[in-house]
A protein has these predicted regions:
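Histone-fold modules and their flanking histone-like tails across chromatin and transcription assemblies
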Residues: 1-24
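Short glycine-centered, acidic/aromatic-flanked micro-motifs in structured strand/loop junctions
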Residues: 35-37
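C-terminal edge-of-domain segments
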Residues: 60-98
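Short, surface-exposed connector motifs at secondary-structure boundaries
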Residues: 26-32
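A broad, low-specificity signal marking well-ordered, structured residues that form hydrophobic/aromatic
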Residues: 6, 31, 82
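A generic structural signal for short, non-catalytic loop/turn and secondary-structure boundary residues
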Residues: 1, 55-57, 77
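Short, hydrophobic/π-rich interface segment
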Residues: 39-60, 71
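Alpha-helix C-cap/termination motif
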Residues: 23-26, 53
């Protein structure tokens, strides 16, 4: 099972859209976007831009969770996580006009 992983951070959203498109050009079975904390909204935006502008038939699964991270002075913090799995259907095509 082939998959590509795109880690979402603080870059502009179109950088991640480009990474997703590049990943799909290698014909993986799925592309996974992973993000934590404040980057979660960027991951959702990148997935939606890719789905609405570039692929007409892209399906997604979303998994959310929490990770414990050690912070300053040994304290633990809870950080939200998201994993968005994008799959391209075999009949998926680029929308006309793009």
């Amino acid at each position: 099972m082939s998959e590509e992983v795109v880690y979402v951070g603080s870059k502009p959203i179109l950088a991640y859209v480009t990474a997703i498109m590049t990943s799909f050009s290698r014909n993986p079975e799925k592309v996974i976007l992973r993000a934590r904390g404040r980057a979660i909204s960027s991951a959702v935006d990148a997935a939606e831009v890719t789905r609405t502008r570039f692929f007409s038939d892209l399906t997604s699964e979303i998994s959310i969770g929490t990770e414990e991270m050690k912070g300053e002075e040994g304290r633990t913090r809870n950080v939200s996580t998201i994993e968005i799995t994008l799959r391209k259907s075999p009949e998926a095509k680029k929308p006309s006009g793009s």
